[in-house]
């Protein structure tokens, strides 16, 4: 179970990075000093609840568990920003500058936050 939890947490970390941090800019983010990825300090506390149900087609009943943590994380974070700030972010990562720009643009157009 510990390895499975680690796989799920790793997928969530990748989704968090996709939503909030990771952006490849040619010539500017070509190393880990400039290309930001989530670290332990960026991760929220998580409680992973496992439901064991063997896959009859998987080897010894195994299933893949990395993707289920990755796939919904970025959309969930972007939906939370929409709910909290009233603006939709159209380009990821949703950096503070991009969120602020979306709020200001929404206000200039007479939107929810304006």
Task: Please annotate each region the language model reported.
Residues 1-114:
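C-terminal catalytic domains of large/alpha subunits in multi-subunit enzymes
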